[in-house]
């Protein structure tokens, strides 16, 4: 029987994250809702304490590295006598025992391998949020994924592994709150304007440039229509992504005032942006493991027009809980799909059906319950 769960993740963002960090958000939102006692072990970034008690069942232990340690052991000599992986194990041994605990490692097979090397008998779970070619020391590893798409991906590559689905989630309380009333006014959007919304990274795999190209044509065919883009167009300073971001900014500038670049927004602000949308568009160019933008838009009661690649199509069902973008995707096909969705007399009913679906399956409360059931299924025997 498991008496304590240790959650951990790569040493990049502290928990709870102060910005958009999906994996760290998942850990925090689920851990604090569990009835099984648990501890989070994560990196200590500037402004975070040594320790944070969240509630009676959840606390956070922060792992800090001094500047001298980093310079001497991680940069100059690369000896690293007390690495991040060992510090995670030390936290486990401080709060529980190897026999009574399981360590859930999020989205880093490298960290899984490092912990396994240092503790061959530890109970480990690998929680993958993306499709990476597996490099695990345990052929029969226990793996959690958010979608059927990702489950099939890992089962094909690790046939002896136990792969189970626990989805990503959203904060139901946030999406029950009344949204900000004056956001349209702040963005200089008329109340009767049709608003298309894109939210996500400004990167080639998300398809935003193709959407901008389609919108440039669409605005000549439809009057009083706006495209709002939520995402940081300066996230990358150099390389291909930076070049892509410049192309996106140039395309938006060419469109003019009908395209509103709203920049990056905090997770707490996103429900206000979904509220102003008539249609939320997810033009992904790659297979998505899940898609939080689609789930959040559905939770806000908004119609979603999305790529059917990967895990998105498991909950965005064409004509039932949303609409699919036709393949192969092009400017013309996107225009046709936008017009089709906006013209559908059942659009609001479809959006309401989608809202009911995500509230019943993807709230953090439901996700935490599914995770807890899976842990008991694997370890309480």
Curated annotation (Swiss-Prot):
Membrane topology, from the record: Peripheral membrane protein
Reactions listed under catalytic activity: UDP-N-acetyl-alpha-D-glucosamine + [lipopolysaccharide] = UDP + N-acetyl-alpha-D-glucosaminyl-[lipopolysaccharide]
GO cellular component, one term: plasma membrane
Disruption phenotype: Mutant lacks a terminal outer core GlcNAc residue and does not express the O antigen, but it can invade epithelial cells as efficiently as the wild-type strain.
Annotated SUPFAM superfamilies: UDP-Glycosyltransferase/glycogen phosphorylase
GO terms for MF: lipopolysaccharide N-acetylglucosaminyltransferase activity
Class in the EC hierarchy, top level: transferase
Record flagged with keyword Lyase: no
EC code: 2.4.1.56
Function: Transferase involved in the biosynthesis of the core oligosaccharide region of lipopolysaccharide (LPS). Catalyzes the addition of the terminal N-acetyl-D-glucosamine (GlcNAc) group to the outer-core glucose II, the last step of the lipid A-core oligosaccharide biosynthesis.
Name recorded for this polypeptide: Lipopolysaccharide 1,2-N-acetylglucosaminetransferase
Organism: Salmonella typhimurium (strain LT2 / SGSC1412 / ATCC 700720)
């Amino acid at each position: 029987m498991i008496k304590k769960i240790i959650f951990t993740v790569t040493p990049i963002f502290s928990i709870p994250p102060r910005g958009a960090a999906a994996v760290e958000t998942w850990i925090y939102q689920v851990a604090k809702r569990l009835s099984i006692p648990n501890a989070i072990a994560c990196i200590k970034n500037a402004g975070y304490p040594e320790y944070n008690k969240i509630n009676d069942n959840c606390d956070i232990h922060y792992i800090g590295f001094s500047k001298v340690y980093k310079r001497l052991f991680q940069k100059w000599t690369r000896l690293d006598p007390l690495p991040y992986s060992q510090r995670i194990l030390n936290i486990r041994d401080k709060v529980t025992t190897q026999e009574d605990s399981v360590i859930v490692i999020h989205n880093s097979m490298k960290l899984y391998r490092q912990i396994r090397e240092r503790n061959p008998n530890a109970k480990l779970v690998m929680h993958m949020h993306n499709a990476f070619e597996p490099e695990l020391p345990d052929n029969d590893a226990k793996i959690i994924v958010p979608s059927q798409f990702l489950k099939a991906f890992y089962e094909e590559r690790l046939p002896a592994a136990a792969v189970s689905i626990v989805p990503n989630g959203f904060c139901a309380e946030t999406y029950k709150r009344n949204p900000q009333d004056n956001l349209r006014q702040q963005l200089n959007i008329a109340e009767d304007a049709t608003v298309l919304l894109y939210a996500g990274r400004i990167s080639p795999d998300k398809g935003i440039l193709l959407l901008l190209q389609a919108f440039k044509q669409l605005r000549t065919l439809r009057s009083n229509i706006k495209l709002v883009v939520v995402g940081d167009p300066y996230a990358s300073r150099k390389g291909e992504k930076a070049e892509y971001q410049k192309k996106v900014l140039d395309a938006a500038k060419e469109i003019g005032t009908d395209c509103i670049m709203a920049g990056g927004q905090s997770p707490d602000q996103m429900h206000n942006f979904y509220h102003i949308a008539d249609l939320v568009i997810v033009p992904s160019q790659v297979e998505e493991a899940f898609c939080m933008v689609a789930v959040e838009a559905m939770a806000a009661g908004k119609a979603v027009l999305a790529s059917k690649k990967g895990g998105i199509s498991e909950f965005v069902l064409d004509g039932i809980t949303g609409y699919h973008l036709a393949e192969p995707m092009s400017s013309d096909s996107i225009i046709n799909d936008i017009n089709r969705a906006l013209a559908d007399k059942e659009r609001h009913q479809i959006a309401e059906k989608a809202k009911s679906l995500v509230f019943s399956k993807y709230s953090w409360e439901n996700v935490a319950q599914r995770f807890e059931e899976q842990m008991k299924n694997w370890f309480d025997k």
